[in-house]
Amino acid sequence: MAAAFSHVIFDLDGTILNTLEDLAAAGNHTCEAHGWPTFAVDEYRYKVGNGMLKLVERFMPAEYAGDGRMFEQALAEFRAYYGEHKEDHTAPYAGTIEMLDRLRAAGVQLAVLTNKDHVSAAPLIEKYFGSERFALVQGRVDAFPPKPEAPVTLHVMEELGADPSTTLYVGDSNVDILTGHNAGLKSAGVSWGFRGRAELESAGADYVVDTQGELAALILGE
């Protein structure tokens, strides 16, 4: 039986890789350097998801809102620290590699679309998943507005030769559900990520799954 979806586009952070501790460490390192308040790791679950620029904006104190010079300094510091420490605690979620291999064996084409800077996303995919599992990896670049805006998703689909009716976007946040819908795709939410089932259902996810096995069965039409 043919798979229900021929192409699947995955979010990165909170979906296939647990990057939260390293993102939090980079954020708190930047905060500490300026004497700003720091945050518990779990608080970063709601700061990430819209790219590094938004993340920095969210951990900076409100008194610096609109201070472009301070923002650029904090962004540069965050990027430098994260670039050196992005693999300290990061790891694929259990069962993810097996799921990806099961999908590839069934002929499903896989891609990654993330708001993480491309210069960080591409090496992480290479390290943890190799070069053969994903046909395309697209991180944040200046040529496109970030997710959930449609242009970058449409670009990925064009590169893949994907049909919207048989393409699924998979992620862990409301941003990801909107990313799929804004490009005319079905969206699946994974409850093991940074945000959880309630946010995914509230955002209008077409599907919400709790395990990698459930996700594979959904994609394969089993």
Task: State where each predicted segment sits.
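Hydrophobic, well-ordered secondary-structure segments
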Residues: 13, 30, 79-88, 111, ...
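Basic, gly/Ser/Thr/Pro-rich low-complexity segments located predominantly at protein N termini
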Residues: 40, 54-56, 100, 176, ...
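N-terminal helical cap/lid subdomain that shapes the substrate entry/recognition surface
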Residues: 2-98, 105-106, 119, 131
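Asp-based, Mg2+/Mn2+-dependent phosphohydrolase catalytic module
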Residues: 1-6, 104, 118, 122-222
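Short amphipathic alpha-helical patches
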Residues: 50-58, 67-71, 79, 83, ...
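Small/polar loops that bind or transfer phosphate-bearing groups
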Residues: 11, 19, 48, 112-113, ...
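Conserved SAM-binding loop
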Residues: 16, 92, 110-113, 169-170, ...
